[in-house]
Amino acid sequence: MLLTLALAAPVLRAPSDRIFGAEIVGRHHDPFTVMQQFARPMSLGLYSQPLTDLTGAAIARGTGPVAAYNWLVLLSFPLSAIAAYLLARHLALTPAAALLAALLFAFSPFHVAQAAYHPHVAQTQWLPLYLLALWRCMDKASGSAIAWLAAATAAVTLSNFYGGLIAAVLTPIAIAAYWFGRARFGPHASRQLALTLGALGMVALAGVAFVWRSAPGVLIDRSALRFERGDLFRFSAKWWSYLVPPVAHPLLGGTARRIWAASDVTVGMLEQQVSVGWSVVVLGTIAICGWAAAFSRRRFGEPRTRMDGRVAGPGPRVGPSGPYAVPILAAVAGVALVCSLSPERTAFGVRFMRPSALLYPIVPMFRAYARFGAIVQLMAALLAGIGAAQLLATRRRAARAWGAALVVLAIAEYAVWPQSLSRDVLPTAAHRWVMQQPAPLRVFDCEPLTAESASVSWLTGGRVALADRIHDDCAEPQLASRLWASGFTHLLVRDTWERPWLDDHAGAEGIHLDAHFADADVFSIVPNDLVYIAAIAGFWPREHRGGASWRWMSGDASWTIVTPTPQPRVTLEVEMHAFHVARALSVRLDDGPEQTLDVAAKARAYRIGPLALTAGPHLLTFHSAEPATTADDVIANGDRRALSFSLGAWKWSTE
């Protein structure tokens, strides 16, 4: 717990303004979607993961949704350590070895990375608890052990979907490995196994019944929720991912990013954070070699030993060879590693199929098979604890020194910098500045409305609104009047091409810089014009080159213009040029007479009007006398848009 508090200190100082975790793959929408779920009344739906969702919603009632997200994630670290420690002690690790394994698992790169984006996947404590309940039940299937197994199975499944998948796939391997490594030597072993399997079967039937009742579509038509098979290659681990340093590492993170960039891994980089560390690999290898040597020495010629420790007489050893956990852990780790890989790989002309290829037709709604790496991390940590204990328990000083050095190196490989594990819940410093102003502002954010940006309005309590189909062009001439009429007092532009454009045209466009930050600017709106454009139709999205920007028009287009007061003589001056050849442009205000302009292929300013405007909205229509031309037909650039005229800067003036 103390280690968690130290790592999360920057977040704990402002738990409702900052969130835990390094921003490995940018501002993804997942954490903010979960926060919004916590803010709503508690409910269950198709995508609910009840144990995590209801816990987060309950915490949010007292702390708020952002802080609830942080607490839910942070609590998973000490809980994962406790669960791993209990499992380690059950497997007969010494207290020191169990503590090392618990810390390595709790603060593994996988857990730290997932905690930044996926609070459900970060609930890794349920995996070791499930294995503990399973293996304890195989030792002695008492009523309480069966009840604990049922509860652990429900917890690992209802905490997150991937936990249920991992448990379901690896349970047969975990049972087989534990049976051959230990359980078969216990009293009434076959009976204990039968009771355990029966309990699991009953829990599985109950789970299917629950899904059938709450979301029958999942069973009837699994393809309705399926991901594309190609996603499995992006979100599955590479075998060498387990050896690459985590990108959040304070010293080696830059090297890791360069490795992933050279391998063209971008979208799936988060799922590749499954590094176990070279020192952990070495310690685990020492544990395996130590077990193999002990097994070889004791296989013949020593007294047979029962599970209760009594000597049964000379001959081959029939009890588990100590430390008995090593082959169990190695077997589960190996299968989990293979399950975490992509569906197939071709080597030397031969295509090798992997478990994810077999699982995809059965459960096509899963794609991030790299998350099996959580079990690899757990098994590797336990093996490392055993290996470290073996080295530190030897009488040879050199071996003890190597053991201590490897433990220190493991800590260094898993090290993170607390400041890098904290980020603002808002996307830029400009957004934070807006929220710090004493007077409530109404700010227009030029960022398009996407899944990643949709949370901004909610997080700012409605102070900041994003670009939409009505307001989608921050480089539009005389934008200030339009935004002012819509109730906005400020304009926020992030670090895009629009930022330098607005800096250059601020005064002329009726905006003035109020706050400048490295990642965004905030402008106050002071409109210069009484005529503004409320809506635009028939134009393609704005383009830009250098200091100029424009929008291409199709064959017909329109502006909805608004003036709060009557304007008897208004002139519109607009920079235009025709596409490819000169064209005639007809312009009409409402139902009035047409004005025809002969627009050349070279850009220049044209005057429309004078126009007589009454107070209120008016429709200004544009019509190309010649049909719009497909760009690709003329300049063979692959552009299939139909173009007629380009409209650049414009200006209204009164006479």
Regions found by a protein language model. Give the residues of each.
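Membrane-embedded helix bundles of polyisoprenyl
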Residues: T4-A6, V73-L91, P95-F180, T196-F210, ...
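Membrane-interface coil-to-helix junctions
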Residues: T4-S80, A106-T124, P128, S159, ...
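Extracytoplasmic
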Residues: D30-P31, V408-D529
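Hydrophobic alpha-helical membrane-interfacial segments at the cytosolic entry of transmembrane helices
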Residues: A151-A152, P187-R213, L225-F233, K238, ...
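Perimembrane helix-loop-helix junctions
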Residues: A167-G201, I288-G301
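Hydrophobic, aromatic-rich transmembrane alpha-helices
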Residues: A176, R182, V276-R306, R310-P323, ...
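Signature aromatic-anchored transmembrane alpha helix within multi-pass, membrane-resident enzymes
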Residues: L197-M202, A294, P303-R306, A312-S321, ...
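Periplasmic/ER-lumenal interhelical loops and adjacent helix-loop junctions
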Residues: A206-W291, Y369, A374
